[in-house]
Amino acid sequence: MPPRLRPLLLRVSLWVLVGSSSPALLHDRSKENGLQLPRLCKFCDVKATTCSNQDQCKSNCNITSICEKNNEVCAAVWRRNDENVTLETICHDPQKRLYGHMLDDSSSEQCVMKEKKDDGGLMFMCSCTGEECNDVLIFSAIDPHKPEEKDEISKVTIISLVPLLVISVAVIVIFYAYRTHKKRKLNKAWEKNVKPKKHKDCSDVCAIMLDDDHSDISSTCANNINHNTELLPIELDIVVGKGRFAEVYKAKLKQNTSEQYETVAVKIFPYEEYASWKTEKDIFSDVNLKHENILQFLTAEERKTDLGKQYWLITAFHARGNLQEYLTRHIISWEDLWKLGGSLARGIAHLHSDHTPCGRPKTPIVHRDLKSSNILVKNDLTCCLCDFGLSLRLDPSLSVDDLANSGQVGTARYMAPEVLESRMNLENMESFKQTDVYSMALVLWEMTSRCNGVGEVKEYEPPFGSKVREHPCVESMKDNVLRDRGRPEIPSSWLNHQGIQMVCETLIECWDHDPEARLTAQCVAERFSEFKHHDKLSGRSCSEEKIPEDGSVTTAK
């Protein structure tokens, strides 16, 4: 066979294989005017290499992969920290940052390595569009046999440029001095006017957020894991959950002796679900995501077993299970509803926020699959969010096309109206957060339906109950939510309890058909903080509605 035909044959073969195992993926990568095949690249995770940053060398990667998106290019990352030299070959979207850097050479046919800033050592990166072009890494694009070009700049030109250079430097120095002086002046004014009693010390807030006393994992163990580069000594116990992409095991994380261990949860993805594992790993790896109402992440691992390659996510274990299971088995009190609902809202509010409680910038994240089975119940009866396999980071660099390609995802029963009919406002990233708020409202309804404060408590049933089948499709939910404008029923008996009445008013605003009319998760969290003392409410909620003494609520939309 001619050598030129081998990459094409491999590409078509892999495409047929992927298309047969994932029809949805094949559909996404087709166009109206015919089939457009994605790029083939070398795809090996970070590993040790003998390749030096001189001349050129081979990646020695034996894995060829089809890129997930048509616009992705081949890329390579070479790093040297102390005496360790590593190489990573991947597919990469050139419109996104890779390790904090934008790659401006994605149109190149060859992988020409360029040095990038890296606090931990030396780093070179490249990107290219050729077939498996990241297999050969070129560290020097200069021909050593080509003579150096003579400097044609005359002395007159150099002399004429010197005054301009001096003036430019002077302007820069003056501007910098002015900005520094202005900044110091503003800082002094801020320190003078701020009232310390209204602000917690940043270190105190961070300590509260990062040291989760209600987790089943000790802080010492978690700290050691975060700095461990070897596979953890884990013994799988029993399966405690199973979803579309992975199975969840209760497991033992062994300590110094065989008698000592920590109980952890291990979410195991098969080889075919690498993309879901990577999405969730990337979400969890954001240090600014840590929050008491978001599942505590320990580490991610790639493991080789007798069944093939597996991808693991290791997290804290919560014995009470997910919220759906808990509500099925238990009737809750008003105080339980207040704790569960308030903690759920706080977790979603942190997920959606663009800053941490300490004020550090943070990329907002939308969950996109909020439901009671994706929420865990902790020992203190507060919630924590989990299962971020469909989540999306709302990076400002994302274009409308990027957002459009994110697709219609989630569980049909919990999908917002605009998601069901694929009519989201992609120009406004807040629209993604509004879909999470709709789903949150349905979960709050589930909690309320099992609260003994409403009187007689019926058996647990999910939102829309018997109106749809157990696993409804999108078309079935369209009939209920769009055509009939249906929502879960709120019996009049629920309104006899002042606190539950206010919860109902809140969730009705959250599942409004108009996304712009819905509350934010932060607003819901603030309301729940007031609901604890519902019988004493006489002020305003975060949406500025008046709450009369008789307990009735008039909502201002």
From Swiss-Prot:
Stretch forming the signal peptide: 1-23
Membrane topology reported for the UniProt record: Single-pass type I membrane protein
Protein name per the record: TGF-beta receptor type-2
Segments on the Cytoplasmic face: 177-557
EC id: 2.7.11.30
InterPro entries linked: Kinase-like_dom_sf (IPR011009), Prot_kinase_dom (IPR000719), Protein_kinase_ATP_BS (IPR017441), Ser-Thr/Tyr_kinase_cat_dom (IPR001245), Ser/Thr_kinase_AS (IPR008271), Snake_toxin-like_sf (IPR045860), TGFB_receptor (IPR000333), Transform_growth_fac-b_typ-2 (IPR017194)
Cofactor: Mg(2+); Mn(2+)
Glycan-carrying positions: N62, N84
Gene: TGFBR2
Chain segments annotated as transmembrane: 156-176
PROSITE patterns referenced in this protein's UniProt entry, alphabetically: PROTEIN_KINASE_ATP, PROTEIN_KINASE_DOM, PROTEIN_KINASE_ST
Catalytic site positions: D369
All copies of domain Protein kinase, residue ranges: 234-537
Tissue spec. comment: Detected at low levels in embryonic heart, brain and lung. Detected at high levels in hatchling heart and lung.
GO biological process: activin receptor signaling pathway; apoptotic process; cardiac epithelial to mesenchymal transition; cell activation; cell migration; cell-cell junction organization; cellular response to growth factor stimulus; detection of hypoxia
Cellular component aspect of the GO annotation: activin receptor complex; caveola; external side of plasma membrane; extracellular matrix; membrane; membrane raft; plasma membrane; receptor complex
Catalytic activity: L-threonyl-[receptor-protein] + ATP = O-phospho-L-threonyl-[receptor-protein] + ADP + H(+); L-seryl-[receptor-protein] + ATP = O-phospho-L-seryl-[receptor-protein] + ADP + H(+)
Amino-acid positions noted as binding ATP in the UniProt annotation, renumbered to this chain: V240, G241, K242, G243, R244, F245, A246, E247, V248, K267
SUPFAM superfamilies (UniProt xref): Protein kinase-like (PK-like), Snake toxin-like
Disulfide bonds: C41-C74, C44-C61, C51-C57, C67-C91, C111-C126, C128-C133
Entry similarity comment: Belongs to the protein kinase superfamily. TKL Ser/Thr protein kinase family. TGFB receptor subfamily.
